[in-house]
Amino acid sequence: MDNYDHLKLENQLCFPLYAASREIIKKYRPFLDEIELTYTQYVAMMVLWERERCSVKELGETLYLDSGTLSPLLKSLEAKGFITRSRSEEDERTVMVEPTLYGGEALREKASPIPQAVGSCFDLSAEEAETLYRLLYKLLGKC
């Protein structure tokens, strides 16, 4: 055993998480292409479908995205007609985001079958999926 075993890729927790994330997102791609969304745009829309309206800051915090990623993402969603951005009436410094009529229920309806379709691609029991879900959120809570 050498002094650098801790630097082997196979000994890193981060690598299988990274690789699995990339592979899972690949499974989403064909479904998301049909509704003209990238994966990051899709998760942003999921937040907006839940909350109906939120600030850019809240959206970024929820999705762990910085403004350098979020700004072009929102610009693209706005150009597609899925969202609108406006200044908060309470605080002009705050930019609010909300789905348009098309980006709201219409797009949500088209996206509705995606989680089940993607989930069926993986050979995980309901118990395994629940355990993985809990462990991943436990890790996120420690970051």
Question: Where are the predicted features?
Answer:
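Charged, amphipathic alpha-helical coiled-coil/dimerization segments
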Residues: I25, K75-R134
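N-terminal leader segment of winged-helix/HTH proteins
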Residues: M1-I35, E130, K138
